[in-house]
Amino acid sequence: MTRPLFVALDGPKGVGKTSLLEAITEVLRADNQKVIRLCEKKSDPFRGETMQLVNRLVRHPDRNLELEVCQRLADSRRWISQHVLTKQPADSIILIDRWYPSDAAFRRIVPFAEILQLNIDRNVQVPDLHVGVVTAAEISWARAGARRRGLSSTVLRGLEEHVACTEAFELAAADQGWFLCRNEGTIEEATGRVVGEINRVVNRLRGHSIGPRR
């Protein structure tokens, strides 16, 4: 392959995505795969300014303001696509913690189809594999509440909003054909499913060159 394999993991809050990422990384590295772990939030040099807009949006929901948030996030992903993803080894597997699929969960006014087009128009890198991590909303809400950092969400304030977020994300996942991992059992079970899907994608692409995907 002429570039890294790009895998994005997204989902609502509290679904165990970070723990799953760590477990997937460990299994792939044990199989002598070169794994690069990235985080959209930590890779985004403009996140501070964007979060100021998000905070305004939470206090005063407005379509134009949410659209501006979506545009800024898409601009950031374009920057990450150009300045971070292109710097990774060609023989690696990039696992990123959140990418544009997460907008399906957290943006409540602008339709996801419109958000997706914003990202496509900016040549944001399209993952070779979109992994949507989900649980029943009540399970992820309880998990998030039990964490040391709690829900740690700017945009969600109650279970009802979290249920809506979960339903919206699962609907987008079905519409877009993302690989859905229901993380309600053991971490080993979920890890095995995702690693198996990553290996299937690798095997499908192996043997012929894959160029830049846009």
Give the role of each language-model region.
Residues 9:
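Hydrophobic anchor at the beta1->P-loop junction of P-loop NTPases
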Residues 18:
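Walker A/P-loop
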